[in-house]
A protein has these predicted regions:
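Alpha-helical scaffold/interaction cores of sigma-54-like transcription cofactors
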Residues: 1-544
Length: 544
């Protein structure tokens, strides 16, 4: 069966950068691509790579190749604040390209050098300075080549000609006059320069109902995108894509088929990559084990209460039970870092809760001042915290008074001994919000919408009480709930985890990617807490 590679694709994660850009979840695209027999998939969200690990793991679980990509906003220059955001699709060819693309994403969110100006942006020079590990397409009608900047276009084209092995001119199938004209211009340019045509789809919805729901939500939020009338931004099978080009009739079909085949050429250029799934605890010392052992044994004599309740022999015996487990579970760097934080807290008169969670089972943690719970005295189980036969990412929650919690988080986010970031958290539309938004778009009276919300029923699902709309409401308001069901639980915003801080010694900007928000002065990790934990990154929770 003939097929192609979809690389220009937007999910609801694009809505974190562009308001209500899609109401389609990534799982829907992945399932559809698998159903169509596609062998690779990329998400090119507008100006972000948010939760790329979730996409990678799900795409690979579906038996397809994950392709790391982004639709970047590109400006002529960062020397002045001009709002000229041209679109380019950037695709990582391999692991080095993955790191490079993450760095470019991080750079685009710098709010101090004009990179972030209404949108996260890189400069055209950044595009032209990419390595051979990055594949580039000219994207959509919002791309540079559809602008009136002749001098700038010539600059890019001259550069692209010298990199034609990895730069492609993107045509699209949308049956609108401007796209038809643009496709023809790109074909002429391709003939003149030897740059290859490739077909992008600029997919924003899995199907027509989701496309309608996208418009409904845009209306509800007062969002309007120019020049989308007549566009078909829904997912296309190979046959549907071919038929769309036949109807568009912008180019000879042999040229279209070649542009479709080029998507598979690009897919073949991309090397799958594995992630380092080892522990990534912050490392403060080169000789961690030696430092740890000395700290632990020295603390027998320096701890204010250890020898008051236990003999030295009893303490040493317990230490010798725990130390090998810490070594085998690779937790020593984490414990040293946690002690470093506790020492700072004590020096700054910050009170921490006496002990929370399984760490209180460790006598070594007690000796080092990480917990105030004496696990020998209270007969607590160490192996609930650390177990060589059940190794998990180490996590210690700490309780603070609110002012101290803020101070500790700020310390972690500014400490020059480590690299750190806030952690992404995503806001979704819940049932009541979906009813209100869709009701507003459908111009239902506010009182009636409020009455509908008041009539929601509470049921228990998997042990949790949740609100649902009963059959009576659904029968009375079929159009309302048609769209409510499509937009409920869709991502509409991004913020930060209220307690967690990502702490590392490795370069977060390239191994994960960072972005910025107007609500915090600190950079934020592109993966949420689940993606970070799955890849063994360290998160400290400062709880109130």
């Amino acid at each position: 069966m003939s097929n192609y590679f979809i690389y220009h694709l937007h999910s609801d994660y694009s809505s974190c950068t562009t308001n209500i850009d899609s109401v389609t979840k990534i799982d829907m695209y992945i399932n559809k691509a698998k159903e169509c027999g596609m062998t690779a998939l990329a998400f090119s969200e507008h100006g972000n790579i948010l939760n790329w690990y979730e996409k990678k793991s799900k795409i690979e679980k579906a038996g397809m190749k994950y392709v790391h990509a982004m639709e970047a906003y590109v400006t002529e220059t960062l020397n002045e604040a001009i709002r000229d955001n041209y679109h380019f699709v950037l695709i990582a060819k391999n692991y080095d390209g993955f790191l490079e693309l993450n760095r470019l994403n991080t750079k685009s969110y710098n709010r101090h050098d004009n990179s972030f100006y209404y949108r996260p942006r890189i400069s055209l020079d950044d595009i032209m300075n990419t390595s051979d590990n990055i594949i580039i397409t000219t994207a959509c009608l919002a791309g540079l080549l559809n602008s009136q900047k002749d001098e700038l276009k010539e600059k890019f084209i001259n550069w692209a000609i010298t990199h034609k092995d990895r730069v492609f001119l993107e045509i699209q199938h949308h049956n609108v006059s401007e796209q038809i004209s643009y496709n023809k211009n790109l074909y002429i340019l391709s003939q003149k320069t030897g740059l290859r045509l490739i077909t992008g789809t600029d997919t924003h919805s899995i199907d027509k109902p989701h496309a309608e729901a996208r418009v409904i939500m845009q209306k509800a939020k007062g969002v309007y995108f120019d020049n989308e009338d007549g566009w078909d931004l829904t997912f296309k099978t190979y046959d549907e894509l071919v038929e769309s080009y036949r109807k568009q009739n912008s180019l000879p079909m042999d040229i279209v088929f070649e542009a479709i085949r080029t998507t598979k050429i690009v897919e073949d250029m991309i090397e799958p990559f594995e992630l380092d799934m080892s522990t990534k605890y912050p490392k403060l010392y080169d000789n961690s084990l030696e430092v740890f052992r000395k700290m632990v044994y020295d603390s027998i004599d320096t701890h204010p209460y250890a020898l008051k309740f236990h003999t030295k022999e009893e303490i040493v015996k317990r230490i010798e039970e725990e130390l090998p487990v810490y070594e085998k579970t690779h937790m020593i760097d984490f414990m040293l870092f946690q002690k470093f934080v506790r020492d700072w807290e004590h020096e700054n008169n910050i009170y921490v809760g006496a002990g929370r969670g399984s760490v209180s089972g460790s006598y070594i943690a007690y000796l080092l001042g990480i917990t105030e719970m004496d696990s020998i005295r209270f007969d607590l189980n160490f192996f609930r915290f650390a177990n060589e036969y059940r190794v998990s990412n180490c996590d210690i929650d700490s309780d603070y008074y609110d002012p101290d919690r803020v101070k500790t988080r700020n310390f972690l986010l500014t400490c020059d001994k480590i690299k750190s970031a806030e952690i992404a958290a995503f806001g979704t539309i819940k049932l009541r919000g979906a009813i209100r938004d869709v009701g507003r778009a459908l111009e239902l009276p506010l009182d009636e919408v409020t009455e509908i919300c008041d009539k929601l029923e509470e049921v228990e699902i998997n042990g949790k009480k949740v609100e649902v709309a009963g059959e009576t409401l659904r029968k009375k308001y079929p159009e309302l709930f048609k769209y409510v069901d499509l937009v409920q639980d869709v991502i509409v915003s991004v913020g930060t985890h209220p307690a967690g801080v990502l702490c590392a010694s490795r370069p977060i900007d390239e191994e994960i990617g960072l972005f910025s928000l107007s609500t915090t002065e600190h950079m934020v990790s592109c993966n949420d807490m689940y993606g970070l934990d799955a890849c063994w990154w360290t998160k400290l929770d400062c709880l109130g």
